[in-house]
């Protein structure tokens, strides 16, 4: 086998590989003879079909298969010999056979050489937060509101009430599509409607008819309504006040607490809040570390890896439609290219961090991650056993552990300061509620 390597552009490489033509001819001949022994063709006894007949019928297909196998095998030998690391599958272009040699060209991309830079320039503000008794009480109050019952009242509507209404919306005196509803139910303070809508209902009683003035946000989804001033003619048909359940052992039973009553509920709530806080704190620090790593390291990315990631993101997006994708057009790659490129870059950079620091997934950490995740389920031991018996899930957890270890390695050289924050403030920002 003879090999020549050409760097075409960027990360693309072109291998020209020559192998003895007799190598292919022998393989083709052997394959034809094997086929002749097992072929069943009318007019010939089993195992007695002439090779010339087999060649006439199947020769082209057999030669094509053999050629593909020879190219694949010799390509692998060539990249090992040349110490090349392909990113994605190669494209093969077979050439002509001149009687002595068969030549083909393999074009592919390689992984970039990654040299980590600016690791000591990564700046991280590490948040410190804890779950207080007041935070637990606040969560219990939220749970009370979620389990509230509502009853009609003869008074003005206040924040927290539910109201029922009929309304008609108009812009410049003309009704717009989707702006009309009857027997519409809304909880005041929920933030479901555009700014000013809920506030305009406060202070009104059932049976009143009134008009409120609002302005659609510039980022509103309907193009024809963005930034437009509108009027809503409203007929308020009912005001319902919330009745919150008492905080006692019966309240605790609503959440499956059968022993220990209210104190057991508080313990469970605190445990869940601590778990969510720990995950959010880790995610916050990781996000800052990754942002610094990306900002200080610019590397060329293989298009093959980006294309592969685009396909993953596209598939995930289609699955979010509930699998009802049979008649849907394929989502354009442009929707995912930027995110895909970012994910590929992060993967390459973290891979280099793992390689440089010779990191291996720590078994104790892997089991800790599984236990933390399983604690959210009714029977954690069953979930832990399931993960430990599933090779694919275990590999996913090892990858998560390795990523955590890589972030921790980067933190050692980063400029880290600590900032104490309140639980509610931090979690609201982490979940996008702030």
Curated annotation (Swiss-Prot):
GO cellular component term, pick one: cytoplasm
Gene Ontology biological process terms from the UniProt entry: 'de novo' cotranslational protein folding; cell division; chaperone-mediated protein folding; protein transport; protein unfolding
Pfam family, one: Trigger_C
Main localization category: cytoplasm
Top-tier EC class: isomerase
Domain PPIase FKBP-type: 160-245
Molecular functions (GO terms): peptidyl-prolyl cis-trans isomerase activity; protein folding chaperone; ribosome binding
Compartments in which it is found: Cytoplasm
InterPro entries given in the database record: PPIase_dom_sf (IPR046357), PPIase_FKBP_dom (IPR001179), Trig_fac (IPR005215), Trigger_fac_C (IPR008880), Trigger_fac_C_sf (IPR037041), Trigger_fac_ribosome-bd_bac (IPR008881), Trigger_fac_ribosome-bd_sf (IPR036611), Trigger_fact/SurA_dom_sf (IPR027304)
Similarity remark: Belongs to the FKBP-type PPIase family. Tig subfamily.
Protein name, UniProt field: Trigger factor
